[in-house]
Regions:
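Class I S-adenosyl-L-methionine
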Residues: 1-115, 125, 130, 371, ...
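Short catalytic/ligand-binding loop motif for oxyanion handling, primarily in non-cytosolic enzymes
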Residues: 86, 152-156, 202-207, 255-256
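Short amphipathic alpha-helix with an adjacent loop that forms part of the alpha/beta core around
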Residues: 128-141
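Internal, well-ordered alpha/beta segment that forms a basic, Gly-enriched binding/recognition surface
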Residues: 144-156, 185-186, 194-195
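Mobile active-site "lid"/loop adjacent to the S-adenosyl-L-methionine
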Residues: 152-175
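Conserved Class I SAM-dependent methyltransferase catalytic core
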Residues: 173-232, 246
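Flexible, glycine-/basic-rich loop-and-beta segments that form/coincide
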Residues: 239-297
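C-terminal target-recognition/interaction regions appended to catalytic cores
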Residues: 299-407
Length: 407
């Protein structure tokens, strides 16, 4: 059992941060206090103001204790908000570390300064003029960066009207996502360790990994746990995405993570599930996901495919040519029909939300004709009138999809 952290009620009414076992259920914490209520919706989106559940701060504390963090270490949270991670200083073994906090949310920093007087605080943009001296950190001091940096895709269609794509960021760390830019900033600061929360998609989606490659190529993943974004206050209950609490250790240049290694990596969730990307086949490896120039007869159109969470929000077969229309090769129609059925019938765990659509390739012939019949019945505006669904099709398809998810 981890050591009990102190209760801090100054400025946050009735917030209890209790010690928890590494596998214990969540406790009442900062998310129940609505502590970002001073921010508008746009402010919460742009600042990434979704604060960290206490049990993950506890987990990071355990990792740092095991590393032997001491007075020669600087523990910095450069997007600290109200300072949830500075409860680390109440751990006896970590009390001697030097603590630095920073956030551009001046209201949050003002309150954090009252709650954690032993921490040196700044209100600077951590993504501009990135260097240790900006925060008074010596070049030779061992640095561990902790926290829950903002992760908002400034190009996303979701909340598009409230996101600010013009936040100042150094050119050499600029990406389409502030969280990715934050990781690149930590690499630029040459942090010895990085213990932060970020979307699992940074690791598992190849485009995201490549955008953040300068960080990952210099760090190895030494500990982690995955949980649902639904644990954050103010987030959607409809489509939780996987968040990883990760401990990275700086290694020799070019000796860090590769995406091929990530695909083989065995990930663990807070609920005790384990999975790897290479543990699944993906139907999207057999079909076109994005618009292309090929044309077929008959013309069948499908909406652009991304991950499973995006599939839940988007259409599948469409009757009109739009910029997001994918022309379907008739020979591969069963695969597209399977995606349509997967959207309709799959009940996937949150940790699969950023996956491509999985299937079992060697067993697909069992349902090939069934998914075509089912998709035709449910998309008659595209395929024409179908009198009845094929008997038993839905049950067989559901059973197959359940088998895929348990695979």
């Amino acid at each position: 059992m981890a050591r009990r952290l102190t209760r801090r009620e100054h400025g946050i009414a009735a917030v209890v941060v209790a010690a928890v076992d590494s596998d214990a259920p969540a406790v009442k914490d900062l998310k129940s206090a609505n502590i970002s209520s001073h921010l508008s919706v746009s402010g919460r989106v742009n600042l990434g103001s979704f604060y960290t559940p206490a049990r993950y701060v506890e987990r990071v504390a355990g990792w740092l204790r095991n590393l032997g963090a001491n007075r020669d270490w600087c523990v910095a949270d450069l997007s600290c908000g109200y300072g949830a991670f500075f409860e680390l200083a109440d751990c006896r073994e970590l009390a001697a570390c030097r603590y630095i906090g920073n956030d551009i949310d001046t209201v949050a920093v003002a309150r954090a300064r009252e709650m954690f007087p032993g921490v040196r605080f700044y209100t600077k943009n951590a993504l501009v003029d990135v260097k240790r001296g900006k925060f008074g950190i010596e070049k030779r001091r061992r640095l561990v960066i902790v926290g829950n940096p903002p992760y908002n895709d400034v190009t996303s269609q979701i909340n598009q009207g409230v996101k600010d794509a013009n936040l100042p960021v150094d050119e050499d760390i600029r990406t389409r996502d502030l969280g990715m830019s934050s990781l690149l900033a930590y690499n630029k600061l040459r942090a010895d360790y990085v213990a932060v929360l970020h979307p699992l998609s940074y690791l598992i989606k190849k485009a995201n990994f490549n955008a953040t490659k300068r960080f990952f190529s210099n760090y190895e993943l030494v500990n982690h746990v995955i949980f649902s974004s639904q644990e954050f206050a103010g987030t959607s209950r409809l489509a939780g995405f996987p968040v990883i609490v990760a401990l990275y250790r700086r290694t020799q240049t070019g000796r860090g993570l590769t995406h091929e290694a990530v695909k083989d990596f065995r990930f663990r969730t807070i609920e005790g599930d384990e999975f790897s990307l290479n543990g699944f086949d993906y139907v999207t490896d057999y079909i076109e996901k994005y618009p292309h120039k090929k044309r077929y007869r008959p013309e069948i159109l499908f909406y652009t495919m991304r991950d499973i969470n995006a599939l839940k929000r988007s259409r599948t077969f469409i009757g009109e040519r739009i910029p997001n229309a994918v022309d379907v090769d008739p020979e591969k129609l069963p695969y597209y029909c399977y995606v349509d059925c997967f959207k309709r019938y799959a009940n996937v765990p949150y940790w699969m939300g950023n996956f491509n659509v999985p299937f079992i390739s060697e067993d697909f012939d069992e349902i090939r004709d069934l998914v075509v019949a089912d998709a035709r019945f449910h998309n008659q505006e595209v395929f024409g009138r179908v009198r009845n669904a094929r008997r038993g099709a839905e049950l067989a398809i559901r059973n197959y999809i359940d088998r895929v998810i348990r695979h």
